Amino acid sequence: MRKKVLITGFDPFDKETVNPSWEAAKRLNGFETEEAIITAEQIPTVFRSALDTLRQAIQKHQPDIVICVGQAGGRMQITPERVAINLADARIPDNEGHQPIDEEISPDGPAAYWTRLPVKRMTAKMKEHGIPAAVSYTAGTFVCNYLFYGLMDHISRTSPHIRGGFIHIPYIPQQTIDKTAPSLSLDTIVRALRIAAVTAAQYDEDVKSPGGTLH
Amino acid sequence: MRKKVLITGFDPFDKETVNPSWEAAKRLNGFETEEAIITAEQIPTVFRSALDTLRQAIQKHQPDIVICVGQAGGRMQITPERVAINLADARIPDNEGHQPIDEEISPDGPAAYWTRLPVKRMTAKMKEHGIPAAVSYTAGTFVCNYLFYGLMDHISRTSPHIRGGFIHIPYIPQQTIDKTAPSLSLDTIVRALRIAAVTAAQYDEDVKSPGGTLH
Amino acid sequence: MRKKVLITGFDPFDKETVNPSWEAAKRLNGFETEEAIITAEQIPTVFRSALDTLRQAIQKHQPDIVICVGQAGGRMQITPERVAINLADARIPDNEGHQPIDEEISPDGPAAYWTRLPVKRMTAKMKEHGIPAAVSYTAGTFVCNYLFYGLMDHISRTSPHIRGGFIHIPYIPQQTIDKTAPSLSLDTIVRALRIAAVTAAQYDEDVKSPGGTLH
Amino acid sequence: MRKKVLITGFDPFDKETVNPSWEAAKRLNGFETEEAIITAEQIPTVFRSALDTLRQAIQKHQPDIVICVGQAGGRMQITPERVAINLADARIPDNEGHQPIDEEISPDGPAAYWTRLPVKRMTAKMKEHGIPAAVSYTAGTFVCNYLFYGLMDHISRTSPHIRGGFIHIPYIPQQTIDKTAPSLSLDTIVRALRIAAVTAAQYDEDVKSPGGTLH
């Protein structure tokens, strides 16, 4: 049976005028295959509001799968995240000026949640299609990790049938005009997220293949 | 009262002939100040044995503080780790040929442990002394994270008065002769670990200052 | 009057199965605007033959402008080259096994030639179109620099009305599946070279704006 | 017969409070072996004055060998430069506010000068001593390249018996506290320059071994 996939992207932050996560997510809104139908929603780069908005979107769309997407400026690959940690520690203020320091996201939640998405399969599938990808083991401690942890905490408490996860993506080329940083084109990112969504719809379980990072 | 600090380093792995973590740790063996006295032990880069060796060293030395140190080839800063995750996922075999894939380190342990060391203070102190340092939020999924998680699991179950943590360090220059990678001199690393040990001995609690990473 | 632009790309080298310079160049073959008409030719990654092939292509097409293009794996921007040096010093053998060491390309040629293309204008124009670009001051010492120097030496001796230059481009994404390296999509590279060709056709002279590198 | 080696370093620029080239050079002042005796002089990071100061130092010390040294922030190796180009193109103003754009350094000089130092030998010797090193083929277009070109132009016209060259060095650790950049310790840099000076004193000619860069 076809799975409903909710994909979210953030609004721009950290002096950027565009956020490739939302640019890519919105292009996938309404995309359908036999396995998956995608809906996209935008999330504010703001602690607390980010999670409120996500919960409302889940309430509204009743998805089988939730994939939150965020910009990881400086990375050169599409990086599905494996683990979310119970820590908000903001190096810069969010879009409303909040800057939590060493705060727990959920006071009675576990130290970390594992993604429920088949991140090794998704990564392998992207690479088969010529897209640079790697599993990541840290989503940072800013709003991206906050949303990822909050998503996993929410669905584990209220709707354990939903599978959730997070994907970090590089800058798009136009963002790197005045900095020296790697980028991937929006087309490549959109293709990567489409592959991720369909793979997540097709497979509940991940493949057991060597992976990991040395540090 | 003066604190006993156990510092561990690994033997060489991944085709290296030297491991800067052990080179640095052994130079600190016997170092004393008013606040701290350091003992060093070597740990094999082998899943399971690493932790057995560490437990024996803790049994033998009865330290107040344990700081495990490991090589993070490619990093350019001294990076105290904040979180250990319950996952062994080896990209390459360890020094005895074991290559666990997606295994839990402790089947009934939590998803993650936080360090008990004041990593922001340690980082700030290193920077005051002109040493590049940053808190890291991922220790990878190889033997370093395995030892870090295993240490925290062990002391939380058997000896919660011990405070433990992990520091990743860059290559030393001689390791980068035939690769293009950053390095720090052994002298700098030794100084950094000494500062870390003394700071950990002086302060139980960390300082609450902005930090974190965007991703 | 419309300018004839010859764009060349290389065949794959250094264990790659594709060379983005030729993939991009061949897509531009036959492209026309009011200012420029583009012809593409492939060049072997072989000392000597590379230059023979280029001279024949110039003879055949009688271009106004020649833009040679080569892969610079590891760069993250489109980088028009400013200077070619009279040195062949091969770190690896070329595609026919030649590995010249510290050889002059032209025994009675100057130590270096400046490009005749308006590289600052080209770079600025690419950036206006959202493409990461920067002027480069070294084309290396392998076949790319060899062809660039040989081109400039040839036209300065035989056909000074022709304006010539070289552009280095990054890997395309599919080349970075099994390495950690930045890339730009083929579409982005094709657009960049089209902008470069048209800009070179429109402007004989470069703009005088701040640029350069600190080292 | 023992060679007199003049080593120069620059004063700080680009918002830095220290320049590792001068910190290292001044530590070598007076250093003697059977082959070499080193004198150090400081050079201002200012177009024109840099060269005036260098010429006076040459006049005063009557060296056999001149090695100018400069900071290349972001590099991770000691990089003897092979070629100086006849171009001043400043991305930022120098320490007196001059910012030449696309200017020739010497209107009737050649497009480039080759170093007269045995840069491959020097690099190999540093690596034998465990120091990361590589020959570089671009000294940039700022005051470093200006001084290097000016040095070679001066001695080729007035004192061709003097052999000259340039070495770029990384940041030292203290400069990278608030940026993410590689560094080498001052001790390592001092050792590297000492090896460079002695090697240059011992060998007039370079070794013919594979080297070079692909781009």
Curated annotation (Swiss-Prot), chains A, B, C, D:
It catalyses: Release of an N-terminal pyroglutamyl group from a polypeptide, the second amino acid generally not being Pro. PROSITE patterns: PYRASE_CYS, PYRASE_GLU. GO terms for biological process: proteolysis. GO terms for cellular component: cytosol. The keyword Protease applies. It is found in: Cytoplasm. One of its GO terms (molecular function) is pyroglutamyl-peptidase activity. Keywords: Cytoplasm, Hydrolase, Protease, Thiol protease. It holds the Pfam family Peptidase_C15. The active site is at E81, C144, H168. It comes from the Bacteria. Signal peptide: none annotated. It is an enzyme of class 3 (hydrolase). Its EC number is 3.4.19.3. Homotetramer. Removes 5-oxoproline from various penultimate amino acid residues except L-proline. NCBIfam families: PRK13197.1, pyro_pdase. PANTHER family: PROTEASE FAMILY C15 PYROGLUTAMYL-PEPTIDASE I-RELATED (PTHR23402), PYROGLUTAMYL-PEPTIDASE I (PTHR23402:SF1). This is Pyrrolidone-carboxylate peptidase. It comes from Bacillus subtilis (strain 168).
